[in-house]
Amino acid sequence: FELIEADIRDLDACRKAASGIDLIYHEAALGSVPRSIADPVTTTEVNIAGFVNMLWAGVQAGVRRFVYASSSSVYGGSRELPKVEAKTGEPLSPYAITKCVNELYAGNFHALYGIDAVGLRYFNVFGPRQNPNGAYAAVIPNFMAALLAHRSPVINGDGSNSRDFTYVANVIEANLLAGTVENPEALNTAYNIAAG
């Protein structure tokens, strides 16, 4: 294992990371809707150009498979339940747009260059060491912090909204399965990673 600390906007760094391997797990992104609204330019540079850099570096290095993080945000404001992979919605943020574009690039690179890709649409991931005080904290660590402090958790709205939460261990398992699946029909698509 070699840790490479670099910026995915740097194509040479991406080439170094892809050299000599046959599988890429691409999890790097600016992963926040509020941050994407505040800074759509940097979000686009990192999440789209950085994604393409990693994908292109993989193609050039002969990587056989590219497993990447997508997002439930590709469903936009769709109220349709359950969320079905083939029916995405209208993106509601710059972050969501970047994830939609990434899925298009993955399909395009498979068609043009033959690299297999699997997108994983994460739904509200939570787990150990998630910072409840961070600027972009998810609701689960906020609820846990409130309960541990003997306070009632804050619920915005009237409580009628629902969310699907996914434990981080399930996300890891989904990545490992996507990286090792042998059925060719399971490749070159995106999957919902959610508890349901």
Residue positions per predicted region:
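N-terminal Rossmann-like NAD(P) cofactor-binding module of classical short-chain dehydrogenase/reductase
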Residues: 22-25, 67
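Catalytic helix-loop patch of NAD(P)-dependent Rossmann-fold dehydrogenases
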Residues: 38-56, 60, 64-65, 74-119, ...
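Conserved NAD(P)H cofactor-binding loop of Rossmann-fold oxidoreductase domains
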Residues: 27-31, 70
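Conserved Rossmann-like nucleotide-binding pocket used by diverse enzymes
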Residues: 4, 14, 44, 118, ...
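Alpha-helical substrate-binding/gating segment
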Residues: 125, 141-154, 163-191
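Active-site beta-alpha loop architecture of Rossmann-like, nucleotide-cofactor-dependent enzymes
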Residues: 9, 30-34
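Conserved Rossmann-fold cofactor-binding substructure of NAD(P)-dependent oxidoreductases
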Residues: 1-23
